[in-house]
């Protein structure tokens, strides 16, 4: 069993906003302010790192433990994250501090790292810069809910990529 700690990714449109980083970017663009609880700390795990971690588990047949916690072990507070978003978006948006209960939501990935020798490579500030750049470039998709304008080859790829995902395993079985 795998537990993923605060998984985040770069959203492609508004329906993909399912993590705190993307929500803060959207709030910054739409509302002009970002709300953050200064007493809430957590660890972020980027999707590429999660995929690598899961691959390592699937690749090995024998496991020392039943439960692994996948975490980047890079602890950040909501206030620090809001500051990163503000900087990445080149914004003068206000960061509104919300007082709440002290909470620390950090899973320890030490057992996984010890057994598999793998650690997270993604740096949250670099990924947030990429996320902010993408969301600002496609502001209409996120704020005004316009449709993402794709080129003809991207539309073709999106329509037919299922075929490739079926044919590759079929070809592997033939070989």
Region spans (language model):
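Short, cationic, amphipathic peptide segments
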Residues: 167-175
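C-terminal substrate-binding subdomain of Rossmann-fold SDR/epimerase-dehydratase oxidoreductases
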Residues: 36-162
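NAD(P)-dependent short-chain dehydrogenase/reductase
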Residues: 1-42, 47, 51
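Intrinsically disordered, low-complexity segments enriched in polar/charged small residues
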Residues: 8, 160, 164-167
